[in-house]
Amino acid sequence: MEAYIRQKRATPGMVQASDMQLVRPMSAVNRNGREVHAYDGPMQFMMSPNNPDQILTSTGNASVTTTPTSPYSDAPLEKLTPSSQDSEDEESTPVDILPSSNSFDSTRHSADHLLTHSAPISPALMNNNGGSHHDSSSGKSVEHSSPQASGHNDTEGDVVGPIEQWVTQPAPQGVLYKCRITRDRKGMDRGLFPIYYLHLERDYGKKVFCLAGRKRKKSKTSNYIISCDPTDLSRQADGFVGKLRSNVFGTTFFVYDSGKKEDHGNPRLDLAVVIYDTNILGFKGPRNMTVLLPGMTEDDQRVKISSADSQQGLLDSWKSKNMDNVVELHNKTPIWNDETQSYVLNFHGRVTQASVKNFQLVHDSDPDYIVMQFGRTSDDIFTMDFRYPLCAFQAFAIALSSFDGKLACE
């Protein structure tokens, strides 16, 4: 199994970061204590024998330019030993090979395959002429985006109020939350049911615990319990926030809050749907995913949508093209780089290893506004950054869906 997983990770379907230049190889001594800003690993991380996503090649080891660690760099964390029985990193989905490019920013994301009737991310800013990153629901790209639209002027967010309330509140506009997900395989069942921890990153390597999630063992489909209490991951716990549930093929994931389906007074709400494209032909490449979110009101509050009691939920609205109260996001299409023979995205130094899990979510109206990005930094550590209109719980659940096995996406 371990040899099979290593062979799967040697395929060119991994997504790497595009914000680094290749230079002459450096010795292992010179690389110690430096932070790498790379193609999410090429070629230093990809050639490392310890890298879980390494690409086997007959050429010599190539290295990458390094820079001194900045105040916002990831603090060094101890790597956890992965279990040989874990197969969460195997799956991939087809994607068209795009023309090679030295910079991802030089090629705009093609939106021809997106629905053009998705609700805007922020209806309150539709009529704002000050270079807002939001447009009308026509689906056309914004021609003149301000620096804030691309997130360059966003302030780093912090937890405000009780953690149980903060994790479900949409992020304020102009605020970027930088988080880290740690996968702990040391739990029960030989690592087959790891626990995932979400922390909000702070200055000087500090972090604040936000959420924890674990897959339920006795369930017909993948079912993750997400809680603010890492010591009690059950639906009866006081810290229970919601759950992530998949269909039998692992191609569609539903995110619900803590409400109960049969409770008519406080029905369970749909907070997100994650749809992964199927790959029945076995093509190799990064995953294609669609994320559906409830629309936002003019005062930046989430529209309440429930699929309980035979009501039309997020997925039903999307299928019937009733998109007035639905926000549709897609993963930003990576660019194929001939030099590194890999798919690349610009993660701005936040991702340091190639992985099929690495992705960025954007809206049809402005592909430059990264709503969420997620990627690997070591064997069991991943970064997760999100901004408006997502909340921490939605972003964490979307990230958890990328860990789950997908039969039809293999």
UniProtKB/Swiss-Prot annotation:
Biased composition (Polar residues): 47-72
Coiled coil region boundaries: none
Keywords: Cytoplasm, Nucleus
Chain intervals for the UniProt region annotation (Disordered): 44-109, 121-159
InterPro entries, sorted: Tubby-like_C (IPR025659), Tubby_C (IPR000007), Tubby_C_CS (IPR018066)
Localization: Cytoplasm; Nucleus
UniProt feature, compositional bias: Basic and acidic residues: 132-143
Pfam families xrefs: Tub (PF01167)
Keyword Nucleus recorded: yes
Stated family: Belongs to the TUB family.
Protein name: Protein king tubby 1
Organism: Aedes aegypti
